[in-house]
């Protein structure tokens, strides 16, 4: 109460004069040009101060006389302060009396206006227990066609008095707790309102927190269809059949398909689609399935199933190969190496989900087989031939044994070195393809003439054969040791198309290199 009476009068002389009920000083200020609706830092006007003040001395006039004079000088009774209260609300709060309330109502004060807490002058009149003021307010509402249907006053759990008002709209039975929700009502049928709607006509001061939507006809519960009933909104009748289902699916996550069932169905479909794969490819598929449990569904590329089956048949006729652990590890653990593929598969595309997974798995197998074919065609040690090529392999193995033998190398004969170089050139594939590995071996331009070594990093697919005689003289004289040197980088513009990669060394190659260094060194 003391907080309501507290008034700030330092910044405005008119407010100070009204607060002290100095009628003559107020008249002089208004005639001198003071603004009658000027407010203080709380947004309170002189009319509000006149309704709140309780200052009485020998020079002050009555509250009714001061308010009447202010209203005659065009004071606005419907201005709201920073808390949303009007002069009529302040009059009801401070028990200004029925005469003051009548003056305000006659000057156009609106009894249905509400403050920021949702209370109107009617609520404050009920809480102040002023029957005469309440009767005047009810009569004013009836005169304006706003008949008050119900005003209830209860005590909350904390002991405070709470008042509800309903203007022009009869209260719904659901608000008073007479109706209970249907037994088949799901949580998605309950609408939760967290903030009150903006009040335009002040027809309701308090609404329900939970609003039960109209249930389906199968449940046997029908909401009120009255235009003013708060249990039904007009726009809900125009909603289609799919929208409520989608809203219920998003609001009730327990209705969705569990991820374990999707994963189980995915594994079964993969097993049905890929029955003729090799054990190494089956290992890579199992590693991919482990990655599916931690990531979204991934897609490598788009390919038709018919094309994939055709490619698989082509590679099966050409001959099966065995994958190395590095290839399986790089293709299964690091599927993000391809930047052009889409990252995730949307869950909304459920009809094409299993089809896309099987296609991506087939494509990954085809891609690994294609990579292996290129790998074996570029490596002279890993190339396998069938038919008449087997005889050439046996001859090359015999010549390799001759090379490892120290006798022809110690003699330094020109014929043995030339025979070895010719044999190596016959086995060399002219379509040079690089491979990647873990070791870094620097080779000179003569390295590609020796068997058992990887192809050099040259741009020209048909490199010129250097003169072997010069190096044979160096070997026979023994003045220089055969040390591998870094290849010269060509300066042709075509070199941009080649990707320089490192070579890998096997134990057999390391032994050959050590034998050569012992012999020539």
Curated annotation (Swiss-Prot):
Organism, scientific name: Xenopus laevis (African clawed frog)
Pfam families membership: Ank_2 (PF12796), Ank_4 (PF13637)
InterPro entries (UniProt xref): AN34A/B/C, Ankyrin_rpt, Ankyrin_rpt-contain_sf
Key words of the record: ANK repeat, Cytoplasm, Nucleus, Repeat
Principal localisation: cytoplasm
Record Gene3D superfamilies: Ankyrin repeat-containing domain
GO annotations of cellular component type: cytoplasm; nucleus
Chain intervals for the UniProt region annotation (Disordered): 161-188
Keyword Transferase: no
Compartmental location: Cytoplasm; Nucleus
ANK repeats: 9-38, 42-79, 83-113, 117-146
Annotated family: Belongs to the ANKRD34 family.
Coiled coil: none
Listed name of the protein: Ankyrin repeat domain-containing protein 34B
Residue stretches of biased makeup (Polar residues): 177-188
């Amino acid at each position: 109460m003391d907080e309501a009476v507290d008034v700030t009068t330092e910044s405005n002389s008119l407010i100070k004069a009204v607060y002290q009920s100095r009628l003559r000083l107020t008249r002089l200020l208004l005639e001198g040009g003071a603004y009658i609706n000027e407010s203080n830092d709380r947004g309170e006007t002189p009319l509000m101060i006149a309704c709140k003040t309780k200052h009485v001395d020998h020079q002050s006039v009555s509250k009714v006389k001061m308010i009447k004079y202010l209203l005659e000088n065009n004071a606005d009774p419907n201005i709201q302060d920073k808390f949303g209260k009007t002069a009529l609300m302040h009059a009801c709060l401070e028990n200004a009396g029925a005469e003051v309330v009548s003056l305000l109502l006659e000057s156009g004060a609106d009894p249905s206006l509400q403050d920021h807490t949702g209370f109107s002058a009617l609520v404050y009149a009920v809480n102040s227990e002023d029957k005469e003021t309440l009767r005047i307010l009810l009569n004013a509402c009836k005169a304006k066609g706003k008949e008050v249907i119900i005003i209830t006053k209860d005590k909350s759990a904390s002991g405070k008095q709470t008042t509800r008002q309903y203007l022009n709209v009869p209260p719904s039975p659901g608000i008073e707790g007479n109706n209970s929700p249907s037994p088949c009502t799901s949580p998605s049928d309950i609408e939760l309102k967290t903030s009150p709607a903006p009040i335009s006509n002040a027809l309701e001061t308090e609404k329900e927190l939970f609003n039960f939507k109209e249930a389906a006809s199968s449940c046997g519960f029908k909401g009120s269809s009255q235009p003013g009933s708060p249990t039904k909104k007009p726009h809900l009748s125009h909603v289609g059949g799919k929208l409520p289902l989608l809203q219920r699916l998003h609001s009730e996550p327990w209705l969705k398909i569990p991820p374990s069932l999707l994963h189980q169905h995915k594994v079964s479909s993969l097993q049905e689609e890929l029955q003729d794969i090799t054990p190494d490819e089956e290992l890579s598929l199992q590693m991919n399935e482990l990655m599916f449990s931690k990531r979204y569904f991934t897609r490598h590329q788009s390919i038709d199933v018919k094309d994939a089956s055709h490619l698989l048949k082509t590679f099966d006729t050409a001959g099966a190969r065995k994958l190395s652990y590095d290839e399986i590890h790089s293709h299964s653990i690091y599927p993000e190496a391809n930047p052009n593929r889409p990252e995730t598969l949307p869950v909304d595309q459920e009809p094409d989900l299993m089809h896309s997974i099987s296609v991506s798995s087939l494509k990954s197998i085809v891609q690994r087989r294609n990579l292996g074919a290129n790998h074996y065609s570029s490596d002279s040690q890993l190339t396998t031939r069938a038919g008449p090529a087997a005889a050439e392999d046996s001859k090359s193995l015999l010549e390799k044994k001759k090379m490892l033998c120290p006798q022809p190398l110690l003699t330094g004969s020109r014929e043995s070195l030339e025979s070895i170089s010719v044999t190596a050139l016959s086995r060399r594939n002219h379509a040079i393809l690089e491979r990647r590995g873990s070791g870094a071996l620097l080779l000179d331009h003569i390295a590609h003439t020796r068997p058992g070594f990887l192809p050099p990093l040259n741009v020209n697919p048909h490199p010129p054969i250097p003169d072997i005689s010069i190096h044979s003289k160096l070997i026979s004289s023994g003045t220089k040791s055969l040390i591998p040197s870094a290849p010269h980088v060509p300066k042709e513009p075509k070199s941009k198309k080649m990707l320089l990669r490192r070579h890998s060394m096997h134990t057999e190659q390391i032994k050959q290199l050590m034998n050569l260094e012992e012999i020539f060194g």
